[in-house]
Amino acid sequence: MAKFMTPVIQDNPSGWGPCAVPEQFRDMPYQPFSKGDRLGKVADWTGATYQDKRYTNKYSSQFGGGSQYAYFHEEDETSFQLVDTARTQKTAYQRNRMRFAQRNLRRDKDRRNMLQFNLQTLPKSAKQKERERIRLQKKFQKQFGVRQKWDQKSQKPRDSSVEVRSDWEVKEEMDFPQLMKMRYLEVSEPQDIECCGALEYYDKAFDRITTRSEKPLRSIKRIFHTVTTTDDPVIRKLAKTQGNVFATDAILATLMSCTRSVYSWDIVVQRVGSKLFFDKRDNSDFDLLTVSETANEPPQDEGNSFNSPRNLAMEATYINHNFSQQCLRMGKERYNFPNPNPFVEDDMDKNEIASVAYRYRRWKLGDDIDLIVRCEHDGVMTGANGEVSFINIKTLNEWDSRHCNGVDWRQKLDSQRGAVIATELKNNSYKLARWTCCALLAGSEYLKLGYVSRYHVKDSSRHVILGTQQFKPNEFASQINLSVENAWGILRCVIDICMKLEEGKYLILKDPNKQVIRVYSLPDGTFSSDEDDEEEEEEEEEEEEEEA
């Protein structure tokens, strides 16, 4: 049977603790220590926790306070050296650095405490919303907070107007900041060589249209000829006897105002002997009018969306063609130039041809450049005294006022037309500059702008005319900050670069994502009709093989 063994109890009547010390521990020196203490520490920093002398050594740790385990090196007089202990003068920043750091730490701590307090007092659903808001705020700051330039928005890469092939060689590169510094003043007065076509008179009833008396835009089926330079029979005839640089007003306006462009575009240059021909590619988008190209956030819809950049450009071109004919007195008296329209055949109905006149003009740029340009007028207008004024008719269209920092035309066009034109200048600076250059080259007395909006925001097929406005090209150029000297300087620079090239075909291409234009040399046969036929035959053969 188990029994209880009473232990030996030591009674110390004069104190506390054991009465006797075992023999093996008698007379042994002891110093409190910790396993975390380093042996032979250079200095003991653990004892300086409290700076107030009233609490010195009261709560300090005594571990490692002795010198039993310290390592002492023998004195070596050779290593003795004097040290300069004089205090250096601190700068104002160094003196206040700790003060600012402590202030920032206190501020951050207060914010964290306040945030924690707010989270504690919110209900559960509100807590989740607050945490989600803080998470999104941190994400936004991480993405955009470190940017130095707030105007650099994240834009997806744009496509080039033409695919650059591997066998194309870069001959020259010009950046926009360099082109913006160009100036050229030695431009002679233009000389009219030949005038062709017939113009209809402008209907002044369109000047009285307001937002309250809007007029539907009609679809007018007329033929518009957009013939390139080398296909123009008049230019071919003139090139035999005079001139060494040939182009159309649309091509030159693209070059003269290129520093405002954002989207990619291209122009074909042919060097034949000592002559230069500026052309556009067949079946290209060169004649399409861009929409909100220079806006801070241009349209970026993709696919078949009616607000995609290409569909908006086709809509704007459709509106411009119809308005330029609807605002004329169609079917009535015409103003005829001495020569007929060179692109109209004899068996064609004259009423099916759009009202347009061609003025072939000549400029002398110095002693070596003889420039011949085909310019266009869209209509003619009679003044109060019966004088005749030639006009260019263009159209600005509203597609959705909620985008691109737009202004609602139906509310602002009559009362604040200046705000509307200022917004359009910001969003369509390049397009307005091109139109102004074309009017200046043609010598038009006025530039007519029509304001056309969608009948409904979601319907891109029906439109209404909300008003018109008239400008003198020179005055409008000053309003939109278009320097005519800079425009001629850019053109002269491009011509000089192309004149230095060898005979052949070249391409001037605006980079789709950079402010730079490049000149590429093209192999023989590029962009020719024979090459297009071969590509079509290859595509047909591939389709037949797939079907087989």
From Swiss-Prot:
Gene Ontology cellular-component annotations: eukaryotic 43S preinitiation complex; eukaryotic 48S preinitiation complex; eukaryotic translation initiation factor 3 complex; eukaryotic translation initiation factor 3 complex, eIF3m; synapse
UniProt-listed Pfam families: eIF-3_zeta (PF05091)
Keywords: Acetylation, Cytoplasm, Initiation factor, Phosphoprotein, Protein biosynthesis, RNA-binding
GO molecular function: mRNA cap binding; RNA binding; translation initiation factor activity
Domain of life of the organism encoding this protein: Eukaryota
Residue positions where N6-acetyllysine is found in the record: 53
Localization per record: Cytoplasm
Region (Disordered): 523-548
Matching InterPro entries: eIF3d
Residue ranges with Acidic residues bias: 529-548
Region feature RNA gate, mapped onto this chain: 285-299
Phosphoserine modified-residue sites: 161, 528-529
Chief localization: cytoplasm
Keyword Protein biosynthesis tagged: yes
UniProt protein name: Eukaryotic translation initiation factor 3 subunit D
Name of the gene encoding the protein in the UniProt record: EIF3D
